[in-house]
């Protein structure tokens, strides 16, 4: 508990612990859930792959957020990469969604666009087919650095 308190103080945010799905090699939450706003998060389509694990995640998230949205796709058996839309790259100016040239691309774009209203007309899709083959998404392959306005940059 001391570690959680220290993390909360350091980051100035509530720390939420999700269980590690032992079927996943890395266990990173950027492949499971994304922050939408103070009241809501978006979960990937975990329920279409592992309903029991999705329920565990959902129950934990519902104790911290008023709304837990979930991606879902019409395909009876979603493509094996469809979980990775949640692993988008987000900047202050644009949200970059991965695409995999599969039927779920458009569905993911529409669902995420409806939730990420602050990015209206500023959501782009980039082919991440090669990247996902190596078990990573756009967020995995990036590094977030906050630069304060007017700060000298290297």
Model-predicted regions and their roles:
Residues 1-154:
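Histidine/cysteine-enriched polar flanking segments
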């Amino acid at each position: 508990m001391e570690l959680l308190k220290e993390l909360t103080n350091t980051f100035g945010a509530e720390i939420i612990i999700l269980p590690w799905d032992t079927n996943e090699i890395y266990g990173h939450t950027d492949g499971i859930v994304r922050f939408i706003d103070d009241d809501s998060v978006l979960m990937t389509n975990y329920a279409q792959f592992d309903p029991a694990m999705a329920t565990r995640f959902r129950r934990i998230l519902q104790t911290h957020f008023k709304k837990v949205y979930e991606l879902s796709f019409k395909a009876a058996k979603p493509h094996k990469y469809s979980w990775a839309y949640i692993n988008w790259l987000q900047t202050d100016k644009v949200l970059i969604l991965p695409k995999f040239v599969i039927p779920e691309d458009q569905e993911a774009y529409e669902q995420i666009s409806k939730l990420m209203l602050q990015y209206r007309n500023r959501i782009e899709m980039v082919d991440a087919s090669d990247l996902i083959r190596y078990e990573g998404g756009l967020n995995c392959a990036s590094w977030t650095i906050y630069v304060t306005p007017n700060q000298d940059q290297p």
